[in-house]
Amino acid sequence: MPSVLWVLFDGGADRPVGRKTPFYVAFKPTIDYLSSLGSCGMLDPISPGIRPGSDTAHLALFGYDPYKYYTGRGAFEALGADVALKPGDVAFRTNLATVDEAGVVIDRRAGRYIAPEEARSVEEVINKIGEEIGKKYGVDVFYKSTVEHRGVLVIRGPVSHRVSDTDPHRVGAKILRSEPLERSKEAALTAEVVNEITLRFMEISKELEINKARRLQGKLPINAILLRGGGYMPQIEPIREKYNIRAAAIAGVALIRGVARAVGMDVYTAPGLGGTKDDVFDQAVKLAVELMSKYDVVFLHVKGTDSTSHDGDFNGKVSVIERLDKALAPYLDKLLNNYFVVTSDHATPVSVKEHTGEPVPILLYGPDVVQDDVSKFSELTCWRGALGRIRGIDVMPILGSYLGLTEKFGE
């Protein structure tokens, strides 16, 4: 029985720069060859004009209405970081950042490329702060670094996810004060804990040895922690029950691992797949192809296209696409006998450096999929494809139909 290999370029879609996009420019003979044999189209991750987060977009792409199932990013980050959440826990996505003396954000990612040993050092400091503050407020606080500047912070106790972010989401703005979004003791307490952690880390970070070393190296100091997306674990029907599909995900980023795990996918990682722009894809693709004999759908997440987009790095984005395509090439014969999907979860134009709301290109190849006249996978060409314009939430039912796994609606 055939299966599906689904490659997703996070933030891969773009706007033209000089009338060309990274997908258009990239030398990707394997993906383009399969495009010439399959059906292409455009996909609205959620709906036209909506700027998706990676969390809500992946929920939709996995076949779950984000307006029904989304309860905040933090819980998915925690799940993907192997943090066991209990009922009532509130989890936040965090960024290690750089601010000036007035608390104005200079860089929301502290230069982005934070070494693992630096991240571990900061993790120890924040957990020590959390222990002290937790005792004061009668809660437990736990922080875990994930990849580069990213991390997750969990508060356990009489708390609420109904508090505002401290992350202003832009450079040049001051760190925000968390405020309760409902009139409850739990929300008020949670906001107090968040604000105290924020202030304490800013104070202590001035004397951290890693920051002294970073300054000597000409790097930005890690002197702030930004919190956003406070949430709790939603109750989600497993994908095997909802779509009769056995699914696996390969990802190096905690958020995507968490969303996949939340919907009941088996989650894997691979050597070289760390969720950065420098990822090496050979082992990840090899694993994906091997897993196709065990699962109906194997999902492979590529983070580097989003990271380079946020950095405004056009050529870097092209390089990520080309490296993934090169890793696919040895398995072309295998792909020709199965189904193959390529798309993005959202556009992150290098000219904007943020998520935007336009549709993204999608390719569906299979031995029995209609062949249209699109021969190159890009935002500029897939409009002509036979798939037309679909939504993210349509993808899983379409795959289930081709695999013969979905039930008929009606008689």
From Swiss-Prot:
Catalytic activity: (2R)-2-phosphoglycerate = (2R)-3-phosphoglycerate
GO biological process, one term: glycolytic process
Keyword Isomerase included in the entry's annotation: yes
Keyword Protease included in the entry's annotation: no
Gene3D superfamilies named among the record's database cross-references: Alkaline Phosphatase, subunit A, Metalloenzyme domain
Top-level taxon in the UniProt lineage: Archaea
E.C. no: 5.4.2.12
Enzyme class label: isomerase
Pathway listed: Carbohydrate degradation; glycolysis; pyruvate from D-glyceraldehyde 3-phosphate: step 3/5
Molecular function in Gene Ontology: metal ion binding; phosphoglycerate mutase activity
Alphabetic keyword roster: Glycolysis, Isomerase
Family annotation (PANTHER family): COFACTOR-INDEPENDENT PHOSPHOGLYCERATE MUTASE, METALLOENZYME DOMAIN-CONTAINING PROTEIN
Function: Catalyzes the interconversion of 2-phosphoglycerate and 3-phosphoglycerate.
Family: Belongs to the BPG-independent phosphoglycerate mutase family. A-PGAM subfamily.
Protein name according to UniProt: 2,3-bisphosphoglycerate-independent phosphoglycerate mutase
Organism listed in the record: Pyrobaculum aerophilum (strain ATCC 51768 / DSM 7523 / JCM 9630 / CIP 104966 / NBRC 100827 / IM2)
